[in-house]
């Protein structure tokens, strides 16, 4: 089976016409949830269910409201709450140098002055820039803003991120 990468989670229904609310987990949400996009639906046990073609999608607050082709009523989609939508690796576009997909960053080791401080476990999108959550042993999670003074180098091939933890970030 080909590789799939998570782009969002269906968190609720929207209205009565078969639309769902999706909490995105991708930098490319506008592309992923636009008309004609094909996504794969996976259940809460990560079993593939079916491919879905986006009929329409729009941003509403922190969610995307998406209608898939073939689903016309709330009863058609209600059972998919908590399910995950993913994109097939073959449908991912090539990125420019210095750009990367979330799945390439999550799990990477994080170093400050060549000292391992933890692993990236999650990427948050609170506003102007992404925030990388670093899991550390014996300490609370570290929240690193993805900005040039903090993130110095990202080596996707080596799963390594070099950072400079500025004063005040690790209090």
From Swiss-Prot:
InterPro entries: PRC-brl_dom, PRC_barrel-like_sf, RimM, RimM_N, RimM_N_sf, Transl_B-barrel_sf
Keyword Kinase: no
BP GO terms, sorted: ribosomal small subunit biogenesis; rRNA processing
Alphabetical UniProt keywords: Chaperone, Cytoplasm, Ribosome biogenesis, rRNA processing
Signal peptide feature range: none
GO molecular function, one term: ribosome binding
Principal place of residence: cytoplasm
GO cellular component, one term: ribosome
Protein's UniProt keywords contain Nucleotide-binding: no
Domains as described in the record: The PRC barrel domain binds ribosomal protein uS19.
Functional description taken from the UniProt entry: An accessory protein needed during the final step in the assembly of 30S ribosomal subunit, possibly for assembly of the head region. Essential for efficient processing of 16S rRNA. May be needed both before and after RbfA during the maturation of 16S rRNA. It has affinity for free ribosomal 30S subunits but not for 70S ribosomes.
Assembly behavior: Binds ribosomal protein uS19.
UniProt family annotation: Belongs to the RimM family.
Protein name: Ribosome maturation factor RimM
Organism: Lactococcus lactis subsp. cremoris (strain MG1363)
This protein's encoding gene: rimM
């Amino acid at each position: 089976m080909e590789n799939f990468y998570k782009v969002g989670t269906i968190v609720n229904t929207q209205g009565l016409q078969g639309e769902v609310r999706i909490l995105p987990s991708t930098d490319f949400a506008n592309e992923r949830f636009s008309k004609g996009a094909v996504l794969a639906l996976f259940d809460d046990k990560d079993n593939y269910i079916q491919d879905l073609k986006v009929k329409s999608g729009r941003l509403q607050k922190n969610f995307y409201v998406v209608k898939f082709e073939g689903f016309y009523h709330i009863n058609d989609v209600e059972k998919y709450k908590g399910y995950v939508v993913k994109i097939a690796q073959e449908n991912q576009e090539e990125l420019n140098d210095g750009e990367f997909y979330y799945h390439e960053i999550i799990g990477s080791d994080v170093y400050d002055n060549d000292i391992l401080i933890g692993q990236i476990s999650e990427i948050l999108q609170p506003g102007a820039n992404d925030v990388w959550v670093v899991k550390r042993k014996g300490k609370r999670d570290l929240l690193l803003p993805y900005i040039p003074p903090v993130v110095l180098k990202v080596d996707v091939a080596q799963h390594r991120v070099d950072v400079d933890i500025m004063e005040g970030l690790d209090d």
